[in-house]
Amino acid sequence: MFVDLNSDLGESFGSWKMGNDDQILPVVTSANIACGFHAGDPLGILKTVRKAVELGVTIGAHVSYPDLVGFGRRNMDLSRDELIADVLYQISALDGLAKVAGSKVQYVKPHGALYNTIAHDQAQAAAVIDAIKMYNPELVLVALAGSNLVEQARAAGLKVVSEAFADRAYNSDGSLVSRRLEGAVLHDSAFVASRVVSMLKNGGVESIDGVFTPIQADTICLHGDTDGALEMSAAIKAELVKNNIEIRPFVNKA
């Protein structure tokens, strides 16, 4: 059994610091790097890209709605053409920086509100899928495990990797509990680490209302910007190793 570990990185902006990139990067196998639309400035993004390349971490474009003020967590009703252009712009920018650093973008993981919206909104999902195919149809799309997007993207010809979240609570339908609600984000490192292993071995987790919810995950997201993120990431990695679950990237870096 094996699994990929990913994290959202490159999200600092000028003097405003977000996350713990230098500490999280050695733990993960895939880096979802901001592209400037929800967070990240060019210099900070390039530094994160270079560090990822140095450590052999796979680079992914963490594309978002154009929402710096809201950190990409506000829904936007963009036209199809706008959304396609926004996604193309972001992938292109990050891929250019990755090329300078001696690597390339190998997957796309939408961020925040865009991630949640395209999990069920077929029109916006189609725009994101088409943008990825226009840029490079070999790019992998990271999507919420069990969401409609997984099958929609596969039917359109994209490679899709299903994602679960280590520190987020789930509703019984497999969706993430809104961050606005109490209990949406988990903070107990030992509990979260054990939960990740259980999810992988048993194919699901207990939802916030106590129902077993099936989740088949190929990659686990470790958030680097939550309280105790470093301790939690280390605990998860240690628990995976203890249970003989190999940690490796989901894409071929050749």
UniProtKB/Swiss-Prot annotation:
NCBIfam families: PRK05406.1-3, PRK05406.1-5. It comes from Acinetobacter baumannii (strain ACICU). PANTHER family: 5-OXOPROLINASE SUBUNIT A (PTHR30292:SF0), UNCHARACTERIZED PROTEIN YBGL-RELATED (PTHR30292). It catalyses: 5-oxo-L-proline + ATP + 2 H2O = L-glutamate + ADP + phosphate + H(+). Its EC number is 3.5.2.9. Belongs to the LamB/PxpA family. GO terms for molecular function: 5-oxoprolinase (ATP-hydrolyzing) activity; ATP binding. Forms a complex composed of PxpA, PxpB and PxpC. Keywords: ATP-binding, Hydrolase, Nucleotide-binding. It is an enzyme of class 3 (hydrolase). GO terms for biological process: carbohydrate metabolic process. Pfam families: LamB_YcsF. Catalyzes the cleavage of 5-oxoproline to form L-glutamate coupled to the hydrolysis of ATP to ADP and inorganic phosphate. Gene3D superfamilies: Glycoside hydrolase/deacetylase (3.20.20.370). InterPro entries: Glyco_hydro/deAcase_b/a-brl, LamB/YcsF/PxpA-like. This is 5-oxoprolinase subunit A. SUPFAM superfamilies: Glycoside hydrolase/deacetylase. The lineage of its organism: Bacteria, Pseudomonadati, Pseudomonadota, Gammaproteobacteria, Moraxellales.
